Structure formats: C-alpha cells, structure tokens
C-alpha cells in the first residue's frame, strides 16, 4: 500500500535486502581473522534499526531499495559477528549447550516477533509498526552501547 507496489515490488525489496546481506557476508569473510569484531557488532546493531526507522518513512521505491540494501547488510553484519563471538568466547565444554540456547532463543523468537508485528500492523499500520519495532531495537542497542562498553572492545 505505502509503495503502491505489488508482489514484484516486494520481490525487489527482498532481493535488495538479500544483496546487502550477501555483500556484508562477503566483506566479513574477506577480513579473515580481525580484532575489531566488537566495533563492527556495535556499528551493525545501531545501523540496522536506524535504517529500519528510515525505511518506515520512505514512500519511493528506488530509495526503499537502497535502504533495504543497507538494512540487509547491517543485519547480517550483526548476526554473523554475534554468532562468531558466541562461539569463540564460550569455553569448549559449554559451547554446545550455549549454542543450543542461543539458537533456540534467536530463531525461536522470530515467529513470536512476526506474530506481534502482524497484530500491530493490523491495528496501527505497516509503517507505524516498523517505526515502533525499529525504535525499540535502537533503544536496546543504544542502552547496550552505553552500559556495556566492553562489547566495543571484543575481538
């Protein structure tokens, strides 16, 4: 409704997000072993909700595609580095259990979040729902940034 598009428009938006995700994954892979994972995690954790906030206001398809490209990149940057840090920082004897809980909470909460977003979108509207969820995500990211400064120093 907002972009006055159809299923093809949605396909292009998802493809833009996927292209950004692929670019980010290739970027991270090209770095090999690097010592600034915490800084990249912080950048991605703040960039993702910022660009989702921007997306909630955009009504032009080409600009939406650009925003989704950056959003996909920031999301994969965050997810990839968070996963890597969990696996490398947890002691060997606990890694399996910690990864099990991490995966369960990470992927297990997606459907609940999708349900909540669907209900909110039905009552408030799509753009408003994206705005609210992005604002909550940005707030949490900034709280972590300011109150857990050690994250920026993770290697």
Locate the predicted segments by residue.
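C-terminal transmembrane bundle of multi-pass solute transporters/carriers
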Residues: 1-155
